[in-house]
Swiss-Prot record:
Its EC number is 1.-.-.-. It comes from Homo sapiens (Human). CDD domains: RRM_ENOX. The gene is ENOX1. GO terms for biological process: ultradian rhythm. Its main location: membrane. Not inhibited by the antitumor sulfonylurea LY181984, the vabilloid capsaicin, and retinoids. It is an enzyme of class 1 (oxidoreductase). Belongs to the ENOX family. One of its GO terms (cellular component) is external side of plasma membrane. This is Ecto-NOX disulfide-thiol exchanger 1.
């Protein structure tokens, strides 16, 4: 029989749910619930399946009839396993496993099939339509809401359809074509949700009251939430118990119990106090007995003998301390000697680098090799200085220890000095040796400073020579650039002269053709008039005059006379300057002289002016290679003679 009143509190749950959640959060683990009242066990397979379903895990091996395939629905639990296959134990107290419900399962695209029952048939929805929506799953949900039922559907038909999903504990049907179904376990709800979207038809009837589209969704129920809270508390108790067992297992063992005082135990303890290997254990027992108040008149002599045995270990401990101090001093001395040897080798390496940077060897290295040597030298000097500072610090510490020993008035020191005079002499020699070492280090530092100053002076001289060479090379490059510019200008002038000569040639050829035609005409006239000889002479004279006139015009065009009175003044000054310098002067010399008279004039203007007057000034080149120099000379007197 199905209990129809098992889910009567479903609609009342939303009002009381916040109070229940707060009580569960505040009292989780502190509320003691008897497991007999819950009717569940740790080894119960259904309880384990429900717990794993709450955690979002998939149980395996559900026996009985299966509504859909295992890939779609959550499978059940195998009672013969008593544990979840392939799943390690999970801590339910970790974040996300408290009162927060697990995330909804991911949807899988599945082709649903027609389900045939005795009283009805379920037809799947169109696979192209989106899957039916569901609300957020409440924690510990075992109850589902089923809507869209046919009007003629009865509780027996509903039970026939949904009992394939699992054991049903209660069904509550409403008059408005919906009902609430409560299952025995939580994973059965997932199988019921699978039927959402199916169209239900009773028998073979086509009546509207005998068909309806099912909508299955999660429902909130007070009983489900209460059982879920109980399970959470049970898991919390199990986790606390497991954690306590783990802490007890990892806790360090307790110290061994100290036996009670007796004369026999006191005799054994006295023997242990005399043994060096068992002294630590025995002294602990002796301390405990004294603190307990075991000392009385009867046991005072025994305790005194044990305290005397403990005191006898003081001498042994002092001897061990002296041995360890001696070993430490030897280790310090070995370290200091090794550090001194390392510092000596550093000095030699730095000396090699300094010798390599001298002029005799330095000039033979390439630029990259010089750079590497300089880097290595700086690195070696830094390491050498660091090692030297470390050694000096060790010596300062030794001197401070010596001064402390001198100021100390310990009786052991006095006894040592009184016992042997040789120790005092050795101490004096050691002080003298240290002072000599200090002086030697000071001399070395002075030598290093002098070397560094010398290297700095040497580098400054090298830098000066390099700067001078660089300036000379820059001047040479500027001269070469200026020569290149002048050569380009001369080339342009030659090209213009060549074009002018071509124009003159074409012009003279045209004149010759005209004169030849005139000559032919005059010959015809001479034949008629008889004055051929005289007229031909006149024509030749006319031709020569025209050619000479054309040449003079071309020379005037080429020379391009002076444009202004300032240019004439400049030509006069330059002519006077070059007349005083018969071997010529370069353009820089001319420009420096002219700039004293006119600060606005440039060297390019002077050079262009000289190039425009080739009969007055000429250009000559002197020197070879880097010493090549261009000079201007005055040739006006020679030009007058040639004309």
């Amino acid at each position: 029989m199905v209990d129809a009143g098992g889910v009567e509190n479903i609609t009342q749950l939303p009002q009381e749910l916040p109070q229940m959640m707060a009580a569960a959060a505040d009292g989780l683990g502190s509320i003691a619930i008897d497991t007999t009242q819950l009717n569940m066990s740790v080894t119960d397979p259904t309880a384990w399946a429900t717990a794993m379903n709450n955690l979002g895990m998939v149980p395996v091996g559900l026996p009985g009839q299966q509504l859909v395939s295992d890939s779609i629905c959550v499978p059940g639990f195998d009672p013969s396993l008593n544990m979840m296959t392939g799943i390690t134990p999970i801590n339910p107290m970790i974040p996300g496993l408290g009162l927060v419900p697990p995330p909804p399962p991911t949807e899988v695209a599945v082709v649903k099939e027609i389900i045939h029952c005795k009283s009805c048939t379920l037809f799947p929805q169109n696979p192209n339509l989106p899957p039916p929506s569901t609300r957020e799953r409440p924690p510990g949900c075992k109850t589902v809401f089923v809507g869209g039922l046919p009007e003629n559907a009865t509780e027996e038909i509903i039970q026939e359809v949904f009992e394939q999903c699992g054991d049903i504990t209660a069904i509550r049907k409403s008059k408005k074509n919906f009902c609430h179904i409560r299952f025995a376990e939580e994973f059965m709800v997932d199988k019921a949700i699978y039927l959402s979207g199916y169209r239900m038809r009773l028998g073979s009837s086509t009546d509207k009251k005998d068909s309806g589209r099912l909508h299955v969704d999660f429902a909130q129920a007070r009983d489900d939430f209460y059982e879920w809270e109980c399970k959470q508390r049970m898991r919390a108790r199990e986790e606390r118990h497991r954690r306590k067992l783990e802490e007890d297992r990892l806790r360090p063992p307790s110290p061994p119990a100290i036996m009670h005082y007796s004369e026999h135990e006191a005799a054994l303890l006295a023997e242990k106090l005399k043994d060096d290997s068992k002294f630590s254990e025995a002294i602990t027992v002796l301390l405990s007995w004294i603190e307990r108040g075991e000392v009385n008149r009867r046991s005072a002599n025994q305790f005194y003998s044990m305290v005397q045995s403990a005191n006898s270990h003081v001498r042994r401990l002092m001897n061990e301390k002296a041995t360890h101090e001696q070993e430490m001093e030897e280790a310090k001395e070995n370290f200091k000697n090794a550090l001194t040897g390392i510092l000596t080798q550093f000095e030699q390496i730095v000396a090699v680098f300094n010798a390599s940077t001298r002029q005799k060897a330095w000039d033979h290295f390439s630029k990259a090799q010089r750079k590497n040597i300089d880097i290595w030298r700086k690195h070696s000097e830094e390491l050498r200085n660091a090692q030297s500072e470390q050694l000096m610090g060790i010596r300062r510490e030794e001197e401070m220890e010596m001064s402390d020993d001198e100021n100390c008035d310990s009786p052991t020191k006095k006894m040592r000095v009184d016992e042997s005079a040789l120790a005092a002499q050795a101490y004096a020699l050691k002080e003298e040796n240290d002072s000599l070492r200090w002086q030697l280090d000071a001399y070395r530092n002075e030598v290093e400073l002098l070397k560094q100053e010398k290297e700095q002076l040497f580098r400054t001289e090298e830098n000066l020579t390099k700067d001078q060479q660089l300036q000379f090379l820059q001047q040479t490059m500027q001269g070469m650039q200026q020569q290149l510019l002048t050569i380009q200008e001369e080339l342009n002038n030659k090209k213009s002269e060549l074009e002018q000569a071509k124009e003159e040639q074409s012009h003279t050829q045209a004149l010759l053709k005209v004169l030849q035609e005139q000559l032919k005409g005059t010959k015809e006239l001479v034949e008629t008039n008889g004055h051929s000889h005289e007229d031909s002479n006149e024509i030749n004279v006319l031709t020569v005059a025209l050619v000479n006139q054309d040449r003079e015009n071309n020379i005037e065009k080429r020379s391009q006379g002076l444009k202004s009175e300032k240019e004439a003044l400049l030509i006069g000054i330059i002519s006077t300057f070059l007349h005083v310098h018969p071997f010529g002067a370069n353009i820089e010399y001319l420009w420096s002289y002219m700039q004293q008279l006119d600060s606005k004039i440039s060297a390019n203007e002077i050079e262009m002016l000289l190039m425009r007057l080739p009969r007055m000034f000429k250009q000559e080149f002197t020197g070879v290679g880097a010493t090549l120099e261009k000079r201007w000379k005055l040739c006006a007197f020679e030009g007058i003679k040639t004309t």
